């Protein structure tokens, strides 16, 4: 993917644009992008609870969050999601599957909030008329995706509030088609997932997750918007809402470490919709990616040392997909 992004791009132009970017605004960009991780931790603390419904201490959740996103940057196939659940289950009295289920809940909220913010950008007068991605109207893609994730949320709400029929159905299917040990593992995982969905049963916690999701993605969009100004891009600020949405869905599937190439391609496609020259768009993408990559990666490596965990251990856990 990175090869496609760099095809026919003049590397000297890319370097020149990066060299002339406003350093102070880049610094603000990095600070804002890094602030999203404490916000993620606060939100996760609302979602993930112990067996009695009590909150966990924030420090272990912070370490699990930084390690997880560091793993996404250094390991392939979105290993950070599994690594984050693995670290949480090793530091707190919570099952791996419950932690992983809570992260799945996060992802649904992320998708719905990003789509809502994308809708703001698409509805703005500055949005390029008849913009398409892959030959399809961007508004059509966003609407279809919103329906899909809305359906996911509806199913999750049903399971959270009436878990017994779901668990009975899973048990029947697992016992019929799987060996005993494999079926037991599936049932154990199902119990953990249901526990991870418990936040959906509490209106107060649900509202809190929505609030912190909005804070998270507005802060993230602000980082993109400040970086627009650092590079002198003549694009409206609401383009940042569209950009983060396209990047977010672009990196949703397992890919290369740090989503290298996917991130740049999504940025290039989005900025081209607003008439940004290719070399400038690529320079923006590479600079943003590199500068925001470093802080969370270093924080994650520091958390590894604090929790006495080796990177190889995370890689093994990610490949196993369970603990």
Q: Where on the chain are the PLM-derived regions?
A:
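Alpha-helical transmembrane segments of MFS and MFS-like solute carriers/permeases
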Residues: 28-32, 208-215, 246
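Membrane-embedded helical hairpins/re-entrant loop segments and their flanking transmembrane helices
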Residues: 41-65, 227-243
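Helix-boundary and loop/linker segments of multi-pass membrane transporters
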Residues: 14-22, 54-58, 92, 195-203, ...
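Transmembrane alpha-helix interface/packing and boundary motifs in multi-pass membrane proteins
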Residues: 32, 68-77, 228-229, 244-264
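Juxtamembrane inter-helical linkers in multi-pass membrane proteins
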Residues: 60-66, 70, 169-193
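Anchoring transmembrane alpha helix of integral membrane proteins
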Residues: 1-48, 320-322
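Alpha-helical transmembrane segments and their immediate interhelical loop/hinge regions
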Residues: 184-231, 235-237
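Transmembrane helix-loop-helix hairpins in multi-pass inner-membrane proteins
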Residues: 1-16, 68-178, 260-323
